[in-house]
From Swiss-Prot:
Keywords: Cytoplasm, Hydrolase. One of its GO terms (molecular function) is nickel cation binding. Gene3D superfamilies: Urease, gamma-like subunit (3.30.280.10). The gene is ureA. It catalyses: urea + 2 H2O + H(+) = hydrogencarbonate + 2 NH4(+). It comes from Cyanothece sp. (strain PCC 7425 / ATCC 29141). The keyword Cytoplasm applies. GO terms for cellular component: cytoplasm. One of its GO terms (biological process) is urea catabolic process. Pathway: Nitrogen metabolism; urea degradation; CO(2) and NH(3) from urea (urease route): step 1/1. This is Urease subunit gamma. InterPro entries: Urease_gamma, Urease_gamma/gamma-beta_su, Urease_gamma_sf, Urease_subunit.
Amino acid sequence: MQLTPQEKDKLLIFTAALLAERRKARGLKLNYPEAIAYISAAILEGARDGRTVSELMNYGTTLLSRNDVMEGIAEMIHEIQVEATFPDGTKLVTVHNPIQ
């Protein structure tokens, strides 16, 4: 299977997000990479579903709360930027203060 670097990155994000989702479901608090992957994968899937950039920017702030992540993680993540593929092309989605 021949994959571009971008496709490999998306698969890596998805794999990390799947792990984070399972850990969250077991009641574990997410660490930094897990939180980033969890939100990033949701943004990528939302773009694939046809949501707009502004919808995804807002949606990204609703996915995790401070109770879902380890202590100090919310303060470490000021923004998350994801290059997502939309029906009309690739766009950069920036989620400011994603963990409320």
